[in-house]
Amino acid sequence: MTLPLAHAFLEQAKTDYSTFEIIRKISDQPSSQWLHLLQMTLEKAAKAYLAAGNENYDRLRESHRVFRRFARKLPHNKRVRDSLNMNAAELKQHIKNLETLIDDIERLVPGRDNYGPTAEYPWRNSQGGFYTPCQYGFEDIVSALNNSARGRNLLRILNRVLSDESWHIAFGITSPN
């Protein structure tokens, strides 16, 4: 079955998020595993909304770091503001408060400009050896997600992004049927 690009990204983001939720609950799973899934969920969810706004497919493929750019669009959407019971200034501040955590998660992607830590591939340490994601704790991010209002708020926003049909409609993501 083929889908419009925005819907395809959204469906994959939902699947990644479901897997994230399952793995995150398993106490002996390395945090790198579920952080990788969370990063991919944020990326694909943002790309769904950006694709619905007619962003070019090739441009979307150029970067893994798109959720912050997308999140900054939320205060400009009346339906989103209304659903969160916030005015534009409040939502803008709310998103701004999440940006450090969003950036930390988006930096988990390996690439030319990222020499570690990443949630996916080993990276070199200062002594010439390597760290491996499955043995690295990612304590700052894990603590923020598990124990802070920022973490809870980011996951609440992400749940809306993935599941709130009114948000989908507001951004032009329509059902493929």
Annotate the PLM regions:
Residues 1-40, 49-60:
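Charged alpha-helical initiation segments
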Residues 1-4, 50, 54-177:
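Long, charged low-complexity segments
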